[in-house]
Amino acid sequence: MKILITLCLSLICMFGFAQNKDEMMIRSMLAKQEKAWNKGDIPHFMEGYWENDSLVYIGKNGPTYGYLNTLHNYEKKYPDTSYMGQLRFDIISVKPLNNDHYFVIGKWHLSRKVGDVGGHFTLLFKKINGAWKIIADHSS
């Protein structure tokens, strides 16, 4: 019986640690995105996204499909650092869906000379080749 209890506790601890490690990786990636954005570096900001035609970004104008289309939309909407401003994410929750997918809910805020803006977002992350990537982004 002791062996069974020890085994169960070990599995619970290992599973919990794996989730925490993955959550920390996701939070770290979002922090890197903030840093890149705040330097005016959209290409490095985009490294958090899945570089694939199946990426979906949903904003006020509806869905945009594909990494390059999403990149071009960011570059068009934020042509320089005065429009980009300073980005801050406030993470509300980071929840595992399974071993390879996480669902993140948060708020975003841009402090800018041309006027502050902000809203909420939901992100679907997938572990691809050992790295967590955003495969779906719904920002409002």
Regions found by a protein language model. Give the residues of each.
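Short, low-complexity N-terminal intrinsically disordered segments enriched in polar/charged residues
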Residues: 4, 8-9, 15-48
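Hydrophobic pocket/interface hotspot
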Residues: 33, 45-46, 54-55, 70, ...
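Structural motif
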Residues: 51, 97-98, 128
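A short gly/proline-enriched turn/hairpin at secondary-structure junctions
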Residues: 54-65, 78-82
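A mature extracytoplasmic/lumenal domain signature
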Residues: 61, 93, 107-108, 123, ...
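Surface-exposed, charged secondary-structure patches
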Residues: 71-114
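Short beta-strand edge/turn micro-motifs at domain boundaries
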Residues: 118-140
